[in-house]
């Protein structure tokens, strides 16, 4: 089974489009396992008070809780790009995903900063260790596909990559 790393940020509309294209293509590739790699589209220094990303930190909480990450990702992309959930309000974010995660528990975890280091480690893994230039980006079997700045990845490019990289 091939492992596909998908690098993305929930606040990136091109990532949302790439995510949905990936979901459509996965049905034709049951031999591909997706490893989600959330990372900030514009990483800020850790000391910056706005350096936290609730969607990404919530991802690590959801992963720890064993939540279906396809459901979580779909919901958070919708919240960030369509419903425009306040990306800096812990309680509003937790309320938005309350049918997936306990809002009180999630709010406490987000406020505590428990997953902030994982967020920064994910950024380092994407940009420093894997040479991601633009997101969404894909890595599989030593092959890579990065988005084109301001355009993203087309469904055709994604489908071609999945076939060639296996």
Region locations from a protein language model:
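Generic intrinsically disordered, low-complexity segments enriched for polar/acidic and small residues
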Residues: 4-5, 69, 74, 85, ...
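Short active-site neighborhood of thiol/selenol oxidoreductases, capturing the structured segment around
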Residues: 1-13
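Structural alpha/beta surface segment adjacent to cysteine/selenocysteine redox centers
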Residues: 10, 16-96
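C-terminal cap of thioredoxin/glutaredoxin-like
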Residues: 19-30, 94-166
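A structure-centric signal for secondary-structure junctions around beta-strands
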Residues: 1, 55, 134-135
């Amino acid at each position: 089974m091939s492992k596909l790393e998908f690098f993305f940020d929930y606040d990136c509309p091109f990532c949302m489009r790439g995510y949905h294209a990936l979901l459509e293509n996965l049905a034709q590739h049951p031999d591909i396992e997706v490893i989600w790699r959330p990372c900030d589209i514009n990483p800020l220094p850790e000391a910056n008070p706005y350096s936290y990303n609730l969607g990404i930190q919530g991802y690590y909480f959801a992963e720890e809780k064993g939540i279906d990450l396809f459901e979580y990702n779909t919901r958070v992309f919708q919240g960030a790009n369509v419903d425009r959930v306040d990306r800096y309000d812990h309680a509003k974010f937790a309320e938005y995903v309350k049918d997936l995660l306990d809002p009180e528990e999630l709010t406490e975890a987000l406020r505590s900063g428990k997953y902030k280091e994982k967020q920064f480690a994910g950024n380092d893994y994407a940009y420093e260790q894997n040479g991601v230039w633009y997101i969404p980006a894909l890595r599989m079997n030593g092959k890579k596909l990065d988005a084109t700045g301001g355009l993203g990845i087309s469904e055709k490019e994604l489908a071609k990559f999945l076939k060639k990289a296996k």
